[in-house]
Amino acid sequence: MGRKGAKAMRFLLSLAVLAALAWSGYWALAARGIERGLAGWLDARRAEGWAADAGRISVTGFPARFDTRLAPLDLADPATGLAWSLPWFGFSAHSHRPQRVTVRWPEAQRIATPTERIEVTAEAMTGALAFRPGLALELVSAQLSVGAFGLVSDAGWRASMDGAEIETAALVDRPGAQRLRLSASGMRPPEKLVATLDPAGLLPPVFQQVAIEAVAVFDAPWDRHAVEDRRPQLRQVEIGRLDAQWGDLALQAAGRFDVDAEGQPSGSLTLRATNWREMIALARGSGRLSAPLADRLEEALGLLAGLSGRPGMLDVPLRLALGQVWLGPVPLGPAPNLRLR
């Protein structure tokens, strides 16, 4: 190698050293910024009256990643009475793409409400989040997956499922709108709820599956202010597909409804029910429908199903109005309140 070649090699080596030093400085500053930012966020929550404590905040992963861990983490919001305790909470991002974050939860967590404490077990619970660049951390998309999941309450109930996946994505052409997809399998609701819905014990204790595709429109973006200040509230929901299977009962739904400031929905849904007579029997047995009303509904719906040529399958238009769910002029029961706390 000649002198020119040696000089070129020394120059390239110097550039590599300078680049490595610059990258090391960037990583160290960014890691320190993450630690200070999290500590500042916890201080701000405490100033607002929260209980917000992280035993230790650490950032590792040099040079390619920022792997952040808070251990343990305890949060409690006095405005809602909700509290969340974890032995650790972790998230990570590539150094060159910090707005895309992978989140990890421990297998054991605890949630407390004003009335009960719930022990949570979650197998392989992970998420992937994408944020718009900026301090607001506005959510662009999210994916959450979990394996076996269980809830045990000190109020005496327990529930579980075999697994679930949730996806959301902001719609660029519709401010505040999020496309939602959810699928869950092997759901075991609390025994008391199953006994209320099915007092005769005709159905299995496990819901085989639920799948939902919908668009939800909120009055504010999902960003850090959704945790610090107020939850974005639903203003409109479009259900493209809802499929649920419980034993021999199958339910499909689609429709659209608005949500007012009090969380009351108004709009319409179309339900397709397979083995719908068993559903009426469940509503009658649980007390949701009185015997005379159940008889009238079964007679009227039987006529509709017969006209369709499929007596075991029924398409039913429902209205949501005045805080009730209606089948024509008949109120079936209260509509759910959709206000987010």
Across the structure, where does each feature detected by a protein language model lie?
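Beta-strand-enriched cores of mature, soluble protein domains
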Residues: E165, L180-A184
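Flexible, membrane-facing loop/turn or short amphipathic-helix motifs
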Residues: D74-A83, Q109-V120, A148-A159, A170, ...
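N-terminal type II signal-anchor transmembrane helix
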Residues: G5-A39
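Short extracytoplasmic/periplasmic juxtamembrane "stem" segments immediately C-terminal to an N-terminal membrane anchor
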Residues: L38-R56
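N-terminal beta-strand/beta-hairpin edge segment
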Residues: W50-D173, L242
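Extended terminal
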Residues: M9-L13, G55-S58, V227-P232, Q236, ...
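Extended lipid/amphipathic-ligand handling interfaces
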Residues: I57-V59, L86-H96, V120-A136, S153, ...
